[in-house]
A protein has these predicted regions:
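Single conserved hydrophobic/aromatic residue that forms the stacking wall/gate
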Residues: 1-6, 11
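Active-site glycine-centered loops adjacent to acidic/histidine catalytic or metal-binding residues
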Residues: 127, 154, 178, 237, ...
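Conserved ATP/PPi-binding loop(s) of AMP-dependent carboxylate-activating enzymes
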Residues: 168, 179-183, 194-226, 263
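AMP-binding/adenylate-forming catalytic core of the ANL superfamily
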Residues: 85-88, 95, 209-210, 214-215, ...
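Beta-strand->loop->alpha-helix junctions that form or flank phosphate-binding loops
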Residues: 98, 149-157, 177-180, 284-287, ...
Length: 360
């Protein structure tokens, strides 16, 4: 997963791994020293992200080397009980790269054990939206975290975290992944490539910094598509800005075109994931003869007493009518995820195209 090219390094991009036979993303090695460090002055950190993922390698290992901290690298299949034992045994003080689904599993397991979690001072998450209920539970279980909880947004091509939110901003705007990190420029562009300066206007997120990749290894065509002449990276993510904070709407490839309306799945997923009794959710677009696409919600429930009608009413109270899913599916098992912890929506879409339904 890692190779050196002169003074640079290559990291395999998980999305391109599936689609393009392991194309590498070359990232400038010098930029890693500029990364904000979750573990400075914290003696022992926990790393659960895979080392072939940018958060594991760059934000985890390399950052720890520069900071001179002790890092416990978790091995093997993710097991919430083992994670809790590691925190207790090694008196872990910081945990960075906590994917929401993994963090939730750990928090669900914590009350079942008589272990000491008071050493934990800092928790940093990412990889997916962080529900407000999960933020509150993290501070409840890890009592000494308080204001030292945060999460951010980034991607392999950007070299790790691009924007980050914690402290007062997180308390006031928990749905935002935050403000740009030092040395990082973020802008929004419309479909014609023009920069958007107004607040609360949707556009594609573009990033420029020393940590942005040099290009896709030995693939100039794709590199030119992703990097413009000013070295701004087109992320493929849609979002908007408000009071200097950025909000992520959806991946460009996830956007659902329902009739003449744009539907951003992440907006719906955040609401569903916050509903008591919903373990996780995914929203996808499925073909529709009249509308082009229809909105479908796939949910994993903790409580089988919850009905789709109940969830639909809840969403109608919080969303525009055209964003409320008209199709629902319940799964008994966890949603399919890649090694980075992200839901593999292409699998769910393929199952829907084949009229596959796991649970009635």
């Amino acid at each position: 997963p890692l190779c050196l090219v002169g003074s640079e390094m290559c990291i395999r991009d998980s999305n391109n791994t599936m689609l393009q036979l392991l194309q590498g993303a070359a990232v400038s090695m010098r930029s890693t020293r500029l990364g904000t460090d979750w573990t400075v002055n914290k003696p022992t950190s926990l790393l659960t992200s895979p080392l072939f993922h940018v958060s594991g390698l760059s934000a985890g290992v390399v950052t720890a080397l520069f900071a001179g901290t002790t890092t416990y690298i978790y091995e093997g299949r993710f097991d919430p009980q083992n994670i809790l034992r590691v925190i207790d045994k090694y008196k872990i003080t910081s945990w960075g790269g906590a994917v929401p689904t993994a963090l939730k599993r750990v928090l669900d397991e914590a009350p079942n054990h008589n272990l000491d979690y008071e050493s934990m001072l800092v928790v940093g998450g990412g990889g997916a939206p962080m529900p407000e209920t999960l933020i509150a539970r993290t501070k409840q279980i890890f009592k000494n975290v308080e204001h030292n909880f945060g999460y951010g947004y980034g991607l392999t091509e950007s070299g790790a975290i691009t924007v980050v939110n914690w402290g007062d901003d997180l308390n006031n705007f928990p749905r935002s992944p935050g403000k740009p990190m030092p040395t990082i420029e973020v802008k929004l562009i419309d479909d014609d490539g023009n920069e958007i300066f107004d607040d609360e206007v949707e556009g594609e997120i573009c990033v420029r910094s020393p940590s942005v990749m040099l290009g896709y290894y030995k693939n100039q065509i794709e590199s030119k598509k992703s990097l413009n002449k000013d070295r701004f990276l087109s992320t493929g993510d849609y979002g908007y800005r408000k009071d200097d904070l950025y909000f992520i709407s959806s991946r460009r490839t996830d956007l659902i075109l329902r009739g003449a309306e744009n539907v951003y799945p992440q907006e719906i997923e955040i609401l569903l994931d916050q509903y008591d009794g919903v373990a996780e959710s995914a929203v996808i677009g499925v073909p529709h003869d009249d509308l082009g696409e229809e909105v479908k919600a796939i949910v994993v429930l903790e409580n089988n007493k919850i009905t789709f009608d109940e969830l639909e009413l809840y969403l109608k109270d919080n969303l525009a009518y055209f964003k409320v899913p008209s199709l629902w599916e319940k799964k008994l098992k966890s949603l399919p995820r890649n090694a980075s912890g992200k839901v593999m929506k292409h699998v769910l879409i393929d199952q829907s195209k084949n009229n596959f339904v796991e649970d009635e």
